[in-house]
Amino acid sequence: MAREFSLAKTRNIGIMAHVDAGKTTTTERILYYTGKIHKIGETHEGASQMDWMEQEQERGITITSAATTAQWDGHRVNIIDTPGHVDFTIEVQRSLRVLDGAVTVLDSQSGVEPQTETVWRQATEYGVPRIVFANKMDKIGADFLYSVQTLHDRLQANAHPIQLPIGAEDDFRGIIDLIKMKAEIYTNDLGTDILEEDIPEEYLEQAQEYREKLIEAVAETDEDLMMKYLEGEEITNDELIAGIRKATINVEFFPVLCGSAFKNKGVQLMLDAVIAYLPSPLDIPAIKGVNPDTDAEEERPASDEEPFAALAFKIMTDPFVGRLTFFRVYSGVLNSGSYVMNTSKGKRERIGRILQMHANSRQEIETVYAGDIAAAVGLKDTTTGDSLTDEKAKVILESIEVPEPVIQLMVEPKSKADQDKMGVALQKLAEEDPTFRVETNVETGETVIAGMGELHLDVLVDRMKREFKVEANVGAPQVSYRETFRASTQARGFFKRQSGGKGQFGDVWIEFTPNEEGKGFEFENAIVGGVVPREFIPAVEKGLIESMANGVLAGYPMVDVKAKLYDGSYHDVDSSETAFKIAASLALKEAAKSAQPAILEPMMLVTITAPEDNLGDVMGHVTARRGRVDGMEAHGNSQIVRAYVPLAEMFGYATVLRSATQGRGTFMMVFDHYEDVPKSVQEEIIKKNKGE
């Protein structure tokens, strides 16, 4: 089958926002107007088309990014709906990795919210062009220009309106297009009858002022336009549109639109803006990768003529077809039934069927082309972030960074039958979600699961019960602490056992130094002259990794340590891998005596919104929880307090805040960084873990 839409007429976009900004409703409306659904599902009724897991429909939030294909104005638009809840950061990251552009949805009453900042920062890291849709203009307290101001103040974004609202709250009835200088008036609530009129007189002056600001802002990003602007020449609408497109694709400018997805206003104009201003796969730089055979950097331009290269960005278990691997094709063509090389794992994989997804219904297709997003059935070894390429033209594309989990729970199966099922269920869930870890406590034999937050683990335990029919008891949430060294030291690990027959002998000298935050464990072999034979070096590294998994103070994994093996000795007969592994772990224990070991705890960036009268309470809450205030701002009659607070102190805070503010206070928290715990807290943690 020939290609249906050219690359220039393809858009791969994500819809990203803070939880509750109306993102899923916006996506629903897009699907409605592009003819994919005939009846609109309301999120708060639990009937939304994109939220197809039972947990999502119950909680009214989007957890997994469903990928959908739609058509608008002769273009194919592939949409990935991303979750706005902080616990599902990895879902946002993996979708940003494969998108070419995004629509950031704001709640017009609140403007930029904490999770908007998180996803905006991630999108900036990945260089994703964005347009902004200020949604919920029909809501009480909606304020479009306030929302635009928060983009400047909180995100330092060069964002400017290309539309203005006519009316607000109940009176929101239309939109002014600042490029055409026309008013679009909605005459019914389905958003299908739109009248294009002249701008009402009372809005004309404001519209002219904002059009002038828009032209100036766009001209600043383009020399030719700047010259025309300074010389007082008129900039045509076509030049303005081209200027906005270029600056948006270069991530130098962010057009802001307005509307109400719930009331069906402004969604079609937003779709027009997706086509007009967001890039096609041809507008963005070719993806880079490394040839696994030569280690040389290679590019894969977006073209059907290039060798096939794709990135797997999501694994899902589907009740009907089993394991689905979602992938983005960067170059080349792929037919169902063919073989590809998973260069990340070095394994050959067969693509069974290829499906194009529409929320939770699907259509089987024979071929995918450069720029497409689809799902494959039949891949056995592929996980999130793996590269799939032509067997004759191998390349490893940049993978997806996975954040470390910060919270853990103990899970215990209720019966022997549940025990076996639980193992399988947890393994499948971990395959789908790289931020979900499953570990068995060596000493107690308990199963511990770790993730990004309470909601994250709640949803996974719930899925284990519903999808895999596993009954389990769940312990209280615990913080995932880490351990590290704060000083450099040298230590010897010497292991010798002679007791009849073959003995054991391993002897190493290792220098330990603190590593940069987030760099993890790094091992360096600095052995000269073979004092430790080459075949035993991997055993030394393995011995360190295994013993670091259980720490030196309280049994928590060690991070951010460099280890340099620089001396040692061996025995011709008695030395073995096991002996050197044990010697390495003894060196680590010895180093702990002088390397100032420390326990690290996750620090959360907490944003608390509360009535002004309760500001004193909130400041007291932060201080009492070992937190430090980072900033405050007033919004209406509320105060917004930003603070860094240890996760360990935040359990149960929702109840405290609710009772202090009579239910009017809310808070959001997102993991920010790890920090040393105070000495007194460290001693308590060590005591507790030793069962004293």
From Swiss-Prot:
Keywords: Cytoplasm, Elongation factor, GTP-binding, Nucleotide-binding, Protein biosynthesis. One of its GO terms (cellular component) is cytoplasm. GTP binds at residues 17-24, 81-85, 135-138. It is found in: Cytoplasm. Residues 8-282 form the tr-type G domain. SMART domains: EFG_C, EFG_IV. Catalyzes the GTP-dependent ribosomal translocation step during translation elongation. During this step, the ribosome changes from the pre-translocational (PRE) to the post-translocational (POST) state as the newly formed A-site-bound peptidyl-tRNA and P-site-bound deacylated tRNA move to the P and E sites, respectively. Catalyzes the coordinated movement of the two tRNA molecules, the mRNA and conformational changes in the ribosome. Belongs to the TRAFAC class translation factor GTPase superfamily. Classic translation factor GTPase family. EF-G/EF-2 subfamily. PANTHER family: RIBOSOME-RELEASING FACTOR 2, MITOCHONDRIAL (PTHR43261:SF1), TRANSLATION ELONGATION FACTOR G-RELATED (PTHR43261). This is Elongation factor G. It comes from Streptococcus pyogenes serotype M1. The gene is fus.
